[in-house]
């Protein structure tokens, strides 16, 4: 046990590193360093069996297929993230957990630092050191995602809207505050592909009907989406399967994705590091 004030790190569990206070509990799985339990202010913010995980991929679009990015960069869909170390410290009322990774299928290193306070609020800094070699695949996006229980089906965000928008097609989407539902996010393209993302976001709130949930902000404007579909369900793989969007069954959950760097459809990119802040919202949040 390490403790300071009411914040405690339990490192004597065989399978989990546990950060807890009277108001919150966050479990890190020792096998991969990922958050597998996130509870705060009486809320269970992760769906059963879900994790908070880094994400380097999105469902390919028609333009991506045309540029063959679905083939060239496919390694980043599952880069073989391998935990190298999981360290923790506790000082000044903040628990700091640092996970470091290598990749099996691409050349690079990843570090994720989590700074957790008594309320269960998390400051996440994710840093990617990717190889700059010409032959290495590029990322389609750089961010994180988590699967939340279906009750968190409301969105309140400040960014571009009200419809989906991306770096290369956003001029017609004005910056403002928008309140929407997850059901409204999925655009039924004829063929399944990336959909529903909002860009230039300053603040994203994912909450239930009572206004309880999480608020995400970042060190600079970011993109985000919340769907009833995992990106894997919208990804047809190496070749077009001529599937139809209406044939895909929605999940009884909410897939929340935050994106700190992203390619435009038909293009790709490389990125460095960023920080995002995940804050707990109670029913009094405005």
Regions found by a protein language model. Name each.
Residues 2-286:
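Beta-strand/loop-rich accessory regions of lumenal/periplasmic or secreted enzymes
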